[in-house]
Amino acid sequence: MPENVASRSGPPAAGPGNRGKGAYQDRDKPAQIRFSNISAAKAVADAIRTSLGPKGMDKMIQDGKGDVTITNDGATILKQMQVLHPAARMLVELSKAQDIEAGDGTTSVVIIAGSLLDSCTKLLQKGIHPTIISESFQKALEKGLEILTDMSRPVQLSDRETLLNSATTSLNSKVVSQYSSLLSPMSVNAVMKVIDPATATSVDLRDIKIVKKLGGTIDDCELVEGLVLTQKVANSGITRVEKAKIGLIQFCLSAPKTDMDNQIVVSDYAQMDRVLREERAYILNLVKQIKKTGCNVLLIQKSILRDALSDLALHFLNKMKIMVVKDIEREDIEFICKTIGTKPVAHIDQFTPDMLGSAELAEEVSLNGSGKLFKITGCTSPGKTVTIVVRGSNKLVIEEAERSIHDALCVIRCLVKKRALIAGGGAPEIELALRLTEYSRTLSGMESYCVRAFADAMEVIPSTLAENAGLNPISTVTELRNRHAQGEKTTGINVRKGGISNILEEMVVQPLLVSVSALTLATETVRSILKIDDVVNTR
């Protein structure tokens, strides 16, 4: 009877007899959360594994509106994936961080993180505490960075051949790899023109503007020292101006409007005539002031309130032989000013000759039946900026070409930041695995075990490269291990030839910063995921 009462009146008090059961259930929950987080994050890594390397596959992504993207750039794939699980979202952020830091290696970093998480699962199942795993991984990372730095070789920015090889390696895994002989030199030239090789420590990629224009093929891509705009020249008569004096205005060349709540009542035609005459005189006065400064090319910022340029103003500008390009986007203003040395003018009273930029030539160029481009070249006081014009037969090709060029530019930026190169083709990862395994033998206890697991996880990159290239991953990785054990540090997988060779001789190289950043960011993310033992939903 007393037992019945106890069971009816709710859960038993936590006496010494049944404290164990409740505590055991609590102890079980963090482990479940951890495994759930790890499996969600691993699912994301597995999704993009097949797109690693030159023989990697591409993904076709369709968004809600039906727009299609074809790419094998890890950051782009993950950005467009709808990931709901918070731990999986951490891997998307990881890829984004790698894209910002290095610009390349966005797929590798996620695959390394996935492999490290796989190792964590095995260690956790053996009963090793997450904190011990986390601290051991940090030790392994520090040792790993030393190993990578030892493997690297310094590079000079004057060594053009090496820069080209790095850019080509980056482009080889892209859809546009067959055009790497055109795009690599273009990327190297672009970066070299916007920096001073002797003193530069970074590259501001905003100084390299990529303009996309539909039509033609990727062979028609070009590098322009100057400014290229996709907007058309507004007045049809003037298409070429030599010794151009260029003004950039942010106000409208049209009749001023009343406030929203004001009205003008016109009772007869004489009053109407007066309004029109006043409008004509107002616009003519604006145009005369522009002409007085010596301006013969006028760029007008896009306006959302009213017409930036009325027909009447265009008529007067045409008469005064001033070339007009309207609808300049607000975000392009800074680049335009830096390129041609002009200053934006917000009011006609500030429009003076010293606000103008000057250039040898401003012209509208026809593109063999696929539209027109407006070019300004031969700037007299050029800022260190260049424009890359990307052409392609359809939107998908142009967008992928733009992403590929961006990656190649980022690779060269990495070399400017950290002037060291490292072999590609899975060579650094195999070397890491080998050297960290040796290092683990010098440690004792659980640490040794965890560092060994970290080392084994590094083999995922060469294994995936081999798998994607149609080679046998097990025999390839085993042979790589043997060759590295014999001291051949730069031996890696030559995907093009389908075998193992000295990767440095094949000129498959990547910046040290890409590998260092990938290893650091992947380890940090894995340590964060390991430390999470509960997920709390809030409203």
From Swiss-Prot:
Amino-acid positions noted as binding ADP in the UniProt annotation, renumbered to this chain: 53, 105-108, 172-174, 425, 510
Subcellular location: Cytoplasm; Melanosome; Cytoplasm, Cytoskeleton, Microtubule organizing center, Centrosome; Cytoplasm, Cytoskeleton, Cilium basal body
Region described as Disordered: spans on this chain: 1-28
Domain of life: Eukaryota
Recorded GO MF terms: ATP binding; ATP hydrolysis activity; ATP-dependent protein folding chaperone; protein folding chaperone; unfolded protein binding
Signal peptide positions on this chain: none
Gene3D superfamilies: GroEL (3.50.7.10), GroEL-like equatorial domain (1.10.560.10), TCP-1-like chaperonin intermediate domain (3.30.260.10)
Main location (coarse class): cytoplasm
Enzymatic class: hydrolase
Binding residues for ATP: 53, 105-106, 174
Record-level GO BP terms: binding of sperm to zona pellucida; chaperone mediated protein folding independent of cofactor; chaperone-mediated protein folding; positive regulation of telomerase RNA localization to Cajal body; positive regulation of telomere maintenance via telomerase; protein folding; protein stabilization; scaRNA localization to Cajal body
InterPro entries: Chap_CCT_delta, Chaperone_TCP-1, Chaperonin_TCP-1_CS, Cpn60/GroEL/TCP-1, GroEL-like_apical_dom_sf, GROEL-like_equatorial_sf, TCP-1-like_intermed_sf, TCP-1_chaperonin
Keywords: Acetylation, ATP-binding, Cell projection, Chaperone, Cilium, Cytoplasm, Cytoskeleton, Disease variant, Hydrolase, Magnesium, Metal-binding, Methylation, Nucleotide-binding, Phosphoprotein
GO CC annotations, alphabetized: cell body; centrosome; chaperonin-containing T-complex; cilium; melanosome; microtubule; nucleoplasm; zona pellucida receptor complex
Reactions it catalyzes: ATP + H2O = ADP + phosphate + H(+)
Enzyme Commission identifier(s): 3.6.1.-
Entry-annotated residues carrying Omega-N-methylarginine: 19
Modified residues (Phosphoserine): 36, 184, 202, 444
Residues found modified as N6-acetyllysine: 21, 288, 302, 319, 326
Residues noted as binding Mg(2+) in the record, renumbered to the chain: 104
Pfam families: Cpn60_TCP1
Disease entry from the Swiss-Prot or TrEMBL record: Defects in Cct4 are a cause of an early onset sensory neuropathy knowm as mutilated foot (mf). The main clinical features include ataxia, insensitivity to pain and foot ulceration. The pathological features include a severe reduction in the number of sensory ganglia and fibers.
Similarity comment text for this entry: Belongs to the TCP-1 chaperonin family.
Assembly, per entry: Component of the chaperonin-containing T-complex (TRiC), a hexadecamer composed of two identical back-to-back stacked rings enclosing a protein folding chamber. Each ring is made up of eight different subunits: TCP1/CCT1, CCT2, CCT3, CCT4, CCT5, CCT6A/CCT6, CCT7, CCT8. Interacts with PACRG. Interacts with DNAAF4. Interacts with DLEC1.
Function comment: Component of the chaperonin-containing T-complex (TRiC), a molecular chaperone complex that assists the folding of actin, tubulin and other proteins upon ATP hydrolysis. The TRiC complex mediates the folding of WRAP53/TCAB1, thereby regulating telomere maintenance. As part of the TRiC complex may play a role in the assembly of BBSome, a complex involved in ciliogenesis regulating transports vesicles to the cilia.
Protein name: T-complex protein 1 subunit delta
Species assigned in the record: Rattus norvegicus
UniProt lineage: Eukaryota, Metazoa, Chordata, Craniata, Vertebrata
Gene for this chain: Cct4
